[in-house]
Design a protein with these regions (language model features):
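Contiguous, well-folded functional domains in the mature portion of proteins
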Residues: 1-214
Length: 214
């Protein structure tokens, strides 16, 4: 009986050690894949707008001046009322879904000056007797040849957005502006008189794919 119990304990410890080792290896591989930041070949040109994110184009919408823009993330409508005073005239809004295997570093869609950064913490808030959920998001407004608005959208619980830039900072097209740590979506807005090149379903790369021509 003693030998049997000793054997059981040995096997448990051995399997637990193997399981723990596999978990550690998996975590290391996940971290390497998720936090990778490869070099990008940024296209040259003053009259182009490039993708701020890796991922898939899930929607292309028109926003009229004075309207409250919104996007849809995982079937949920996310209103962006903070943009109402920022965008003037008619804008095109391209939404890009970032999957778990996409690079999660975001880049400037144009060259210009950062004129505004707006951070919305997100979380769960009481409203009209119910709990209202608001997604964490960070908004970077860049003025260059045109004005672009890049919205990084994360989840509703933990802080998951890192912003790499500051207001009044001058950026070159393709410069890194931030990172979203977990499953996420990025929206880029630009004047509607620009010519949109991408279409819904296209795969795009941050800092490389041209999404519109000014």
């Amino acid at each position: 009986m003693h030998l049997f119990l000793t054997f059981v304990v040995y096997q448990f410890k051995r399997n637990a050690a193997i399981f723990l080792s596999l978990c550690i290896i998996g975590l290391v591989i996940f971290s390497i894949v998720f936090y990778r930041d490869p070099q990008r070949s940024v296209p040259i040109g003053e009259n182009i707008i490039i993708s701020p994110a890796d991922g898939k184009v899930v929607s292309i919408d028109s926003v009229k001046g004075g309207e409250i823009p919104f996007t849809i993330k995982n079937g949920e409508i996310i209103y962006l009322p903070e943009l109402k005073g920022i965008i003037e005239g008619n804008f095109t809004m391209v939404s890009i879904f970032m999957g778990p295997f996409d690079v999660h570093v975001n880049r400037a869609p144009i060259s210009g000056n950062v004129i505004d950064i707006i951070y919305i913490e997100g979380g769960h808030f009481p409203a009209f007797g119910n709990v209202f959920t608001e997604n964490e998001r960070n908004i970077v407004v860049i003025d260059g040849n045109v004005r672009t608005v890049t919205v990084q959208i994360a989840g509703t619980v933990a802080r998951r957005i890192d912003c790499f830039v500051n207001e009044d900072q001058t950026l070159e097209i393709g410069d890194k502006i931030g990172r979203i740590k977990l499953g996420s979506q990025v929206v880029v807005m630009y004047p509607s008189d620009s010519s949109t090149i991408v279409k819904i379903g296209d795969k795009v790369k941050a800092g490389e794919t041209i999404i519109a021509q000014i």
